[in-house]
């Protein structure tokens, strides 16, 4: 009887493992972050809601690709659309969402980047994250910097000191293949 009961629970509890692992991953990421936990979760929600709003926008359907990255209520938009009006539309849709403090609209006009370029951007993001481990500023934690790469341009977001931000840019700008580094840091001096 106990074996039958246990066998019946396995499918039900099986769904708990991904939730538990996901929760641990979010908790670990939040533990290293300088944002408070509420802001960390709000940023994830903004990413989700903004992406859904852009996907649902009739003026953007099938007209390109826009990616969303939220950090401390600042939203970075990257990607490609077909016209200046669509760039403005994407920015307007996201700027009206609750909790969004500022939109940095880096969407460009043109065809979607191809698979090879997307793959190179993924590789550049990995190389940039790895380069951040070379930053030699006391108490700098490279996991506190969010790295987004679009068409060879690397965007750096995070709550950092001026020294940390400058050192991060200095490391990332020498990564082979990086076309440009854009600082979107918010500066705060470390607590003493």
State where each predicted segment sits:
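C-terminal motif of bacterial Sec signal peptides marking the signal peptidase cleavage site
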Residues: 2, 11-15
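N-terminal targeting leaders
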Residues: 15-192
């Amino acid at each position: 009887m106990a074996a039958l009961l246990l066998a019946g629970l396995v499918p039900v509890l099986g769904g708990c493992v991904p939730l538990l692992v996901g929760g641990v991953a979010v908790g670990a990421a939040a533990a290293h972050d300088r944002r408070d936990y509420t802001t960390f979760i709000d940023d994830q929600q903004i990413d989700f809601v903004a992406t859904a709003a852009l996907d649902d926008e009739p003026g953007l359907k099938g007209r390109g690709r826009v990616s969303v990255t939220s950090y401390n209520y600042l939203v970075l938009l990257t990607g490609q659309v077909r016209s200046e009006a669509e760039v403005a539309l994407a920015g307007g849709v996201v700027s009206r969402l609750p909790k969004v403090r500022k939109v940095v609209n880096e969407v460009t006009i043109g065809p979607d980047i191809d698979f090879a370029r997307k793959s190179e951007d993924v590789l550049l993001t990995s190389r940039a994250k790895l380069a951040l481990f070379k930053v030699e500023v006391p108490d700098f934690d490279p996991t506190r910097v969010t790295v987004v790469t679009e068409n060879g341009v690397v965007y750096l977001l995070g709550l950092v000191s001026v020294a940390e931000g400058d050192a991060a840019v200095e490391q990332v700008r020498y990564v082979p293949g990086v076309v440009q580094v854009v600082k979107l840091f918010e500066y705060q001096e470390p607590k003493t």
